[in-house]
UniProtKB/Swiss-Prot annotation:
Pfam families assigned to the protein according to its UniProt record, in alphabetical order: TAGT
Protein name, entry field: Beta-glucosyl-HMC-alpha-glucosyl-transferase
Spans traversing the lipid bilayer: none
The keyword 4Fe-4S is annotated on this UniProt entry: no
Pathways involved: Genetic information processing; DNA modification
InterPro entries for this protein: TAGT
Organism encoding this protein: Enterobacteria phage T2
The entry's keywords: Glycosyltransferase, Transferase
Source taxonomy: Viruses, Duplodnaviria, Heunggongvirae, Uroviricota, Caudoviricetes
One Gene Ontology term from the biological process aspect of the record: DNA modification
One MF term in the entry's GO annotations: glycosyltransferase activity
Length: 280
């Protein structure tokens, strides 16, 4: 069964991701050694607390450590302020909406697990449930291939190695790097719309915000652009208006993903035969 893994740092008392799990499922929270007791006291009855050394570098290093520790397993890494919910189509404007009120029931949670287990069996060794920032219509279907997203990612670590994923090769924007890195090795990515996520406020205190700044963020994007120039392209409009990640003069840069392909993968055809892409 898929193991949910929640990397967390300086967020004792704010791990809202735990709200999505039924009582008979044990998620794992991965924390620095010096925070083990605080997290255990707060969440030990609801999750297994896993430690990594204090000197692990940032969120990218944390994700690398997780892919090392869980080698051979199927995992789903999810931000500590993120929960996965059901979605439905709103007929009046043909918009897919996330259920912001209700968590998954126990039955729905295990259906989600099976849905992604099926995706992995079909060849989708990495994927995510979408954060609905932009409008998702019925024409998008229940999922889309090679569409980038963040806040959560699943991996079949029986099929993918830490080296193949590439965490730790870039300090920030590590999920974007891993997404492109795996696609370019021939591993398609699956973005789910049937299930959507509710996530906390961007750059809340703690977590990766403790090491993020405009300059560090921009240097990471520049590295991604150098390695994947055709698929990670600069978005030039409204850069000056982007919210700053810190009190700096440097404007925040933005990349847009250009990776969609008309020809679908073998994994897509296998998964579509089990779970049709078309909205009911």
């Amino acid at each position: 069964m898929i193991q949910f893994v929640i990397p967390s740092y300086q967020h004792v008392g704010a791990v809202s991701a735990l709200d999505m799990f039924p009582t008979d499922y044990e998620p794992h929270i991965v924390v620095r050694e010096h925070e083990e007791k605080a997290y255990y006291d707060a969440y030990g009855s609801r999750a297994k607390i896993i430690t990594i050394p204090d000197d692990v570098n940032g969120i990218a290093g944390t994700r690398k450590a997780i892919t090392d520790m869980y080698a051979g397993q199927r995992i789903w890494m999810i931000d500590d302020d993120t929960t996965i919910r059901m979605s439905s189509m709103r007929k009046r404007d043909d918009r897919r909406c996330v259920d912001k009120v209700n968590q998954l029931t126990r039955e729905q949670f295990y259906e989600l697990i099976q849905y992604v287990e099926d995706a992995m069996d079909c060849g989708y060794y990495h994927g995510h449930a979408r954060l609905p920032i932009f409008k998702i219509t019925s024409s998008w279907g229940n999922y889309r291939e090679n569409s980038y997203g963040f806040t959560n990612t699943w991996y079949d670590l029986g099929k993918l190695t830490t080296e193949q994923i590439g965490y730790g090769k870039i300090d920030l924007c590590e999920d974007m790097y891993a997404f492109l890195n795996l696609i370019n090795q021939g591993y398609p990515h699956l973005a789910l719309f049937k299930y959507l996520v509710v996530s906390g406020k961007a750059q809340a205190p703690g977590g990766c915000s403790s090491i993020r700044s405009n300059s560090k963020h921009n240097r990471a994007l520049e590295q991604i652009n150098r390695e994947f120039p055709e698929q990670a392209r600069w978005k030039t409009s409204n850069i000056e208006k982007r919210k700053s990640l810190g009190e700096e003069d440097e404007s925040l840069k933005v990349l847009r993903m250009c990776v969609s392909r008309k020809e679908k993968s073998e994994a897509f055809h296998k998964f579509n035969a089990i779970h049709p892409i078309a909205v009911d």
